[in-house]
Amino acid sequence: MTGPMAVRTDRTPLVVVGDALLDRDLTGTADRLAPDAPVPVVQECAERIRPGGAALAAYLAARDGREVTLIAGVGEDPAGLALRELLAPWLKLIPLPLTGTVPEKTRVLAQDRPVVRLDRGGGRVREATDEARDALGCARAVLVSDYGRGAADALRDVLAARPPLVWDPHPRGGPPVPGTRLVTPAEKEAHGFAPSEGRPGGGLRAAALNAAALVRDWRVAAVTVTLGSRGALLSYGEHPLLVPAPAAHHGDSCGAGDRFAATAAGLLADGALVGEAVEGAVGAATAFVAAGGAAAVPPAGSERALAALPDTDDPGALAARIRAEHGTVVAAGGCFDLLHAGHVGLLQAARRLGDCLVVCVNSDASVRRGKGGGRPVNPLADRVRVLRALACVDAVAVFDEDTPERLLGELRPDVWVKGGDYAGADLPEAGLLKEWGGQAVLLPYLDGRSSTALLARAAEGAR
């Protein structure tokens, strides 16, 4: 089953195995304490539900435009039925029989800050099904999200015979099967999983020792320890590799691990090297937190009417259609003269923030005024053609002014994206976005990648 977003045929289908949760946020305000106890009174709560656990990882992968099958314990209880309804437009669900009910995680937030979390429903998977075994047996790419509620255990023999690309472990889950290509524990989880020679405490050295010990103990190809705003540390050879997060964003990190695992699995499935997959996953997770984490993911249920994006040359019509269907319009801008890895990474991360991405491109005259003689190297028609060929770009709009403010006023995007090289500077378009409730955000940018630097190196080499 395809989701509201068009499935990209150039992306390898992904099977996600694990434990599905139903996440619920109750968000309100708190300006006083209860008279009978020193606890805040949260009032005027708005309720929102979304997929959690393996279901969130699968949902995020589907939002990337990938064909996804989720194998998880989902029953006919109210939480299970709600989860089925949320996921149905996006992916194929192969339910495993469940003893008990789907686990629910409820967060109460005041001014977007967690006050308390309530957990209920301790359902566990009883057994595997033939349908699940068959789906795994012919899967080209597998992600395991093991929260210790029986899904991975029930299918362990099949997983052992066909090691997954990525295994996202959690404290109550078991070890990954030998041969797994990449395991993605968080820093605290890695310390808990590490054998006796693992280094206790925090810091990069402890993470490196723990990761190396887990590679040996689990007999897997690689372990990457996620470090929050510091990035991730990858161990798969003689020396560890630190992949820093290009820009630190301290926000709601709920779901960031699922975003990391889903991105890494997708990149590996499409042929990326492990180091490339981790770098892409760090960027995606950083962008995810910057946009508000799982709480900011557009509600799955409200998007069921969204059809595949139209093949249109009218960015304004596309933006209007997405808004009318309660979707999120994302825009990014630049010259994009010599398209490089920094551009591509930025645009891929931007696309994950909403339901369409419109790229605003400077005209040739605008580039000349801003960059000087000799620019652009590539004329506008070529730059637009290359951008339209990217799977993450849904439409391209051109502006002739020095800034895209007029064009943004016409498109009225919900999110305006700039690269991390603007970090510390005021975004000139931020005030304009506020006029219609939009948000300007910084996303990670690969250091050292720029068209100007490429031209300088080319000129140096020609001497």
From Swiss-Prot:
Residues 1-313 are annotated as: Ribokinase. Residues 331-463 are annotated as: Cytidylyltransferase. The keyword 4Fe-4S does not apply. Pathway: Nucleotide-sugar biosynthesis; ADP-L-glycero-beta-D-manno-heptose biosynthesis; ADP-L-glycero-beta-D-manno-heptose from D-glycero-beta-D-manno-heptose 7-phosphate: step 1/4; Nucleotide-sugar biosynthesis; ADP-L-glycero-beta-D-manno-heptose biosynthesis; ADP-L-glycero-beta-D-manno-heptose from D-glycero-beta-D-manno-heptose 7-phosphate: step 3/4. One of its GO terms (molecular function) is DNA-binding transcription factor activity. It catalyses: D-glycero-beta-D-manno-heptose 7-phosphate + ATP = D-glycero-beta-D-manno-heptose 1,7-bisphosphate + ADP + H(+); D-glycero-beta-D-manno-heptose 1-phosphate + ATP + H(+) = ADP-D-glycero-beta-D-manno-heptose + diphosphate. Keywords: ATP-binding, Carbohydrate metabolism, Kinase, Multifunctional enzyme, Nucleotide-binding, Nucleotidyltransferase, Transferase. Its EC number is 2.7.1.167, 2.7.7.70. It is an enzyme of class 2 (transferase). The active site is at D258. It holds the Pfam family PfkB. One of its GO terms (biological process) is ADP-L-glycero-beta-D-manno-heptose biosynthetic process. HAMAP family: HldE (MF_01603). Homodimer. Catalyzes the ADP transfer from ATP to D-glycero-beta-D-manno-heptose 1-phosphate, yielding ADP-D-glycero-beta-D-manno-heptose. In the N-terminal section; belongs to the carbohydrate kinase PfkB family. In the C-terminal section; belongs to the cytidylyltransferase family. This is Bifunctional protein HldE.
